[in-house]
């Protein structure tokens, strides 16, 4: 059983229950914030995984800071930093506060509350939080470090489409330029015909929408 569509005869794609009936296409954005969702790993690798492990995350932190620091002043002032409910073993939150100030850190208990106030969401992992963001209809991009993520062969095509359409970035300068370009009205880009088709393809492959599950 998998969220992702699999080719094997003995696999079944099932929709994640907590995403059902939540997908939205927004015609306007009430939020004003740039929501930055940080990614976390444990101090020690204790299993095989296709994402950053242990101290790999430190290189990731450098990219995040460079991205945030190079945003235009008017966008930087709208940053809301949110970290997941885990122990901050790598002290990224403390580093963020030292660089930007505590006033930019979210004080909301639920992610949905930050979504409601957001104009654009920056994800840092192709995991559950990204799926949740896609469901909200709020424009989003993913900032990744290229050599720290491994993809199964059947996802390479979708990954490349997301990258060529400026949803996935592995270069922080390119991500900064894109955010600067779309900031005034991110929905012009996000709701374009090309992006809408790509979002539909993403849900079909990675997050099946089916009420009869």
What are these regions (language model features)?
Residues 6, 39-41, 127:
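Short glycine-rich anion-binding loops that position phosphate/pyrophosphate groups of nucleotides
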Residues 2, 36, 81, 123, ...:
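Redox-cofactor binding/interface segments in oxidoreductases and associated redox assembly factors
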Residues 75-136, 146-147:
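Donor nucleotide-activated moiety binding/catalytic core segment of transferases
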Residues 1, 208-212:
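Short, intrinsically disordered, charge-balanced linker/junction segments flanking boundaries
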Residues 14-98:
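Conserved catalytic-core segment of nucleotide-activated headgroup transferases in glycan assembly
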Residues 5-6, 17-19, 108-110, 145-150:
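Short, acidic/turn-prone active-site loops that include or flank metal/cofactor-
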Residues 11-13, 29, 97-100, 120, ...:
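Catalytic binding pocket for nucleotide-activated donors in carbohydrate/polymer assembly enzymes
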Residues 1-18, 130:
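Active-site and donor-binding regions of nucleotide-sugar-utilizing enzymes
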